[in-house]
Regions:
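Bacterial Sec-dependent N-terminal signal peptides
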Residues: 1-30
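Short N-terminal segments immediately surrounding and downstream of signal-peptide cleavage
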Residues: 27-46
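Acidic/histidine-rich, surface-exposed loop or edge segments in extracytoplasmic proteins
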Residues: 27-32, 95-107
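Short, contiguous alpha-helical
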Residues: 38-42, 49, 59-102, 142-185
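A broad detector of short, well-ordered amphipathic alpha-helices
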Residues: 42, 46, 80, 116-119, ...
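Well-ordered alpha-helical scaffold segments within catalytic/enzyme domains
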Residues: 47, 51-52, 86, 124, ...
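Acidic/histidine-rich alpha-helical segments that form the ligand environment
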Residues: 106-140, 152-160
Length: 185
């Protein structure tokens, strides 16, 4: 009998400690989420700049395969999509140079031009996140035939730039250069 009481007492102590942890945990506020998103965009900008600075300027025209985009074109696509997707998510006007033919313009494909457009796109996304209204994050948007929330589209914008930066890792490696180390924090 004494063992049963002791086991019951231990069980209820354990259960009580779990319940107190759960009730003392606080949910993230919208401001916390917005701050984390801004921090992630700042980190992504710094990480992408490491990629831009790792690839030699004379290799920006390099293509992993003839049918694919060059390194410069990948990064210009990233820049255009950053602005277009984030503008759609936040109902802001896109930057004046935002055009899906930007990546095909020879004048935009130099290392200096690519760095300009990419950095401008990250600054645009950072400002859009910082100035976004969390009360509107649940509003629906339709893009490319898909309906999603503004918040989800902001997240998909981040996912998209991660995907295209990641693709350029192969371009750097094929030039016998070590790509930047992963930057999770």
């Amino acid at each position: 009998m004494r063992k049963i009481i002791s086991l019951n007492a231990l069980f209820f102590l354990f259960l009580g400690s779990i319940l107190s942890i759960n009730t003392s945990a606080q949910a993230l506020s919208n401001d916390d989420i917005k701050m984390q998103m801004a921090n992630d965009w700042q980190r992504a900008k710094a990480y992408t700049n490491e990629y831009l600075n790792t690839m030699p300027a004379d290799k920006y025209s390099f293509k992993a395969v003839d049918s694919l985009r060059s390194f410069a074109m990948q990064m210009l696509h990233l820049a255009t999509a950053n602005v277009f997707l984030m503008a759609t998510a936040t109902d802001q006007s896109p930057l004046p140079w935002t055009s899906f033919d930007l990546e095909k313009r020879k004048s935009a494909q130099s290392a200096d031009s690519v760095k300009y457009y990419v950095n401008a796109s990250y600054d645009y996304c950072l400002d859009a996140v910082k100035n976004s209204d969390p009360a509107k994050w649940k509003e629906k948007k339709t893009i490319f035939g898909f309906e999603t929330t503004k918040y989800a589209l902001m997240q998909k914008t981040f996912e998209h730039q991660t995907h295209h930066r990641g693709q350029t890792t192969v371009y750097i490696r094929l030039n016998n250069i070590k790509p930047p180390q992963e930057k999770l924090f």
